[in-house]
């Protein structure tokens, strides 16, 4: 923090629809670069782990699991970073699919906003 302000960034990595592994790598690259620039709050687009235009694929367990796997990889990699990140992903809760934002920092998920 400098003069009571923190550096925030809205980031928009290159994504591929339904390619969670690729999207995770792109998000991580952007997150690491932002952290190196002193960004303390990094905000990524909704559904950035899956791509926004998946349509009926959002209902497929394979895509949902891919997003959760990607989120875990981001959590693990964030242990070394002092940046709070928000990433969008589909999340199945009690049989209902939600458009969520996961909030994490230093390897720990802090919140999932539905």
What positions do the PLM features span?
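Hydrophobic structural segments
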Residues: 1-114
